């Protein structure tokens, strides 16, 4: 079995377990929730199989939906994030994305931070708009997106530093 495949399997299981056991129970003031399980989609190898990523993103989201007993907004948000990932790479990294020289989990520079921030905001915006699903609640969804996005971004950056402490 390839080392990258093993790392991805362990990352999938570890992030989903951490989400289920710790982060699903954490909220700040009832507005900000943390969803670091999306790090799996963010840290998936640039040159990895895109169809497999879409399938794994759906599986990751549907597992989260099962844990929270929700109707599928996590699955939709994860699949949309996985689908938009190449566009986000092009926006954040420009031409270097084409040569697949990017490793998100090495160190956090402005390009990587921009990619992570955009990924988190897109995921959360889709998630909360699907959860609220009323025009009158759009401001509440935007507030939850902003607060949860900041919370998730901080946790994701800390997690990346904890995963690869020797490379910083």
Feature annotation, model-predicted:
Residues 1-168:
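Terminal, non-globular segments
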């Amino acid at each position: 079995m390839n080392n990258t495949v093993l790392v991805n399997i362990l990352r999938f299981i570890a992030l989903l377990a951490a989400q289920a056991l710790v982060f699903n129970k954490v909220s700040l003031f009832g507005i900000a929730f943390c969803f670091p399980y999306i790090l799996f989609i963010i840290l998936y190898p640039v040159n990895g199989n895109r169809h497999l990523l879409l399938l794994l993103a759906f599986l990751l989201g549907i597992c989260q939906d099962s844990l929270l007993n929700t109707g599928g907004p996590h699955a939709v948000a994860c699949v949309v994030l996985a689908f938009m990932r190449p566009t986000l790479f092009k926006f954040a990294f420009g031409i270097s994305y084409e040569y697949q020289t990017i490793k998100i989990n090495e160190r956090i520079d402005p390009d990587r931070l921009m990619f992570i921030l955009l990924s988190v905001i897109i995921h959360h915006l889709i998630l909360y708009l699907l959860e609220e699903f009323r025009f009158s609640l759009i401001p509440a969804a935007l507030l939850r997106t902003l607060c949860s996005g900041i919370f998730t971004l901080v946790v994701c950056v800390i997690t990346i530093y904890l995963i690869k402490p020797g490379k910083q």
